[in-house]
Amino acid sequence: MLFELRDVGLDRDGRAVLDSFSAGIPEGSTALVGPSGAGKSTLLRLLNRLADPDRGEIAYRSRPLSSYEPLALRREVALVPQLPALLEGTVESNLRYAAELAGERFDGEGTLRRAGLDPSFAERDATKLSVGEQQRAMLARALAQRPAVLLLDEPTAALDHAARDRIEAALAELRRQQELSTVLVTHDPEQARRLGDQVLEMPA
């Protein structure tokens, strides 16, 4: 099992944003669905150790998640947030920074292609991209780390159909090649079925 969650709870401002949640997330592609406020994005933050649970236990590859040093874990378990946050400079400089931070060999062209982008995209100014281009650049930046697991927080929520299709095509190819495991948060049940080997529904 990739991740195991046992009675996990997290409180914010005096209320439970996740309460007694238990689930197993296997290797492969898992889609998380559920109503707004169910804690889907919160769960991704917990899996990436951007937050730690107030109650319960999370295991990653049968080892307590809390035993992993956060930065070391994030090199292996990469998060693509819903809102793009690229650094100033070119797309290539963003990818190179991510690869170097993770101690990985930099392969700009290969990384861009895996994210569904043409290699010429490398010289684009990262701060002047469309929202769809930013999201694909964020996917490429996460892939530059060569993670074992990719966490995706509604990566197509703010995109038009064409941009959504490009992101989905890139994720479908990664899934087909079984390069890494993915955990995808989505409000779209159809997208969950298209991109998930397993669909995990989180209760309200």
Region locations from a protein language model:
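Conserved ABC ATPase signature
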Residues: 125-129, 133
